[in-house]
Amino acid sequence: MQRHMLKSKIHRAAVTHCELHYEGSCAIDEDLLEAANLIENERIDIWNINNGERFSTYAIKGERGSGMISLNGSAARRAQLGDLVIIAAFAMVDEAELQAGWKPKLVFIDEGNKIKGHRDHVPTQTWT
């Protein structure tokens, strides 16, 4: 059996560009792509924390070290500059890989879209 699992997540990145007339996609700083184990043309889901929008597109390379998160084409209508987003990708993982310890790559971002930390799991949610 295969399971559809979270593979990659870039958490709380700020949108830096919205390019309506650029060919559709989301340009992501190459440093962030690599840290999250994402590749060019990979399908990604984007969840806008500010307005609740959820949509899918594909990743393209943004300038390395720039902090770029550019929503292009129709995706540009789903966010405004400065909105915080979660970028995620999923993969089909078989039971043997899961049993062998397969883990996702979770990347946490600071206010300048620079990496502030990594994890390989989502913590258990508790009551506060």
Curated annotation (Swiss-Prot):
Biochemical pathway: Cofactor biosynthesis; (R)-pantothenate biosynthesis; beta-alanine from L-aspartate: step 1/1
EC assignment: 4.1.1.11
A UniProt-annotated Pfam family: Asp_decarbox
Enzyme class: lyase
A GO CC term attached to the entry: cytosol
UniProt keyword Manganese present: no
Sites bearing Pyruvic acid (Ser), chain numbering: S25
Catalysed transformations (reactions): L-aspartate + H(+) = beta-alanine + CO2
UniProt-recorded Gene Ontology molecular function terms: aspartate 1-decarboxylase activity
PTMs per UniProt: Is synthesized initially as an inactive proenzyme, which is activated by self-cleavage at a specific serine bond to produce a beta-subunit with a hydroxyl group at its C-terminus and an alpha-subunit with a pyruvoyl group at its N-terminus.
CDD domains recorded: Asp_decarbox
Record key words, sorted: Autocatalytic cleavage, Cytoplasm, Decarboxylase, Lyase, Pantothenate biosynthesis, Pyruvate, Schiff base, Zymogen
Signal peptide: none
Cofactor descriptive note: Binds 1 pyruvoyl group covalently per subunit.
Gene3D superfamilies reported in the protein's UniProt record: 2.40.40.20
A GO biological process held by the record: pantothenate biosynthetic process
Subcellular location: Cytoplasm
Active-site residues from the entry: S25, Y58
Entry annotated with the keyword Cytoplasm: yes
Cofactor(s) named in the record: pyruvate
Binding, substrate: T57, G73, S74, A75
Subunit structure: Heterooctamer of four alpha and four beta subunits.
Reported function: Catalyzes the pyruvoyl-dependent decarboxylation of aspartate to produce beta-alanine.
Protein family per UniProt: Belongs to the PanD family.
Listed PANTHER family: ASPARTATE 1-DECARBOXYLASE
Protein name: Aspartate 1-decarboxylase
UniProt organism field: Burkholderia ambifaria (strain MC40-6)
